[in-house]
From Swiss-Prot:
GO molecular-function terms, A-Z: 5S rRNA binding; structural constituent of ribosome
NCBIfam families named among the record's database cross-references: L18_bact
Pfam families (alphabetical): Ribosomal_L18p
PANTHER family assigned: 39S RIBOSOMAL PROTEIN L18, MITOCHONDRIAL (PTHR12899), LARGE RIBOSOMAL SUBUNIT PROTEIN UL18M (PTHR12899:SF3)
Species whose genome carries this gene: Agathobacter rectalis (strain ATCC 33656 / DSM 3377 / JCM 17463 / KCTC 5835 / VPI 0990)
Function comment: This is one of the proteins that bind and probably mediate the attachment of the 5S RNA into the large ribosomal subunit, where it forms part of the central protuberance.
GO BP term, example: translation
Name recorded for this polypeptide: Large ribosomal subunit protein uL18
Record-linked SUPFAM superfamilies: Translational machinery components
Domain of life: Bacteria
GO cellular component assignments: cytoplasm; ribonucleoprotein complex; ribosome
Entry-linked InterPro entries: Ribosomal_uL18_bac-type, Ribosomal_uL18_bac/euk
Amino acid sequence: MVSKKSRTEVRVKKHNRMRNHLAGTAQRPRLAVFRSNNHMYAQIIDDTVGNTLVSASTLDKDIKAELEKTNNVDAAAKLGTVIAKKALDKGISTVVFDRGGFIYAGKVKALAEAAREAGLDF
């Protein structure tokens, strides 16, 4: 009997394949996105050293206070603008976008477009 793999297993497998080709450097770090059922998380990572340079999530008090819900497209767009502003304050203007195996639609797309509008290049 052939068993069907879960969505999470398929997503993790896609992410591992992508990570073989994506790597963040000091000049162009990686913007990694993670989406759970209730929240979204974004980190800007320098993979050569293994350090997180900037991070933000919908759990942050200043972001959460402005939102009705933390798991919709509006929350993702707000997170994109916040992560872009934090990155620009640290002197990071270009990044490599790592969608984490998630489909580039909905919340992930909203976060990416908001980050681009706020000044990040990718």
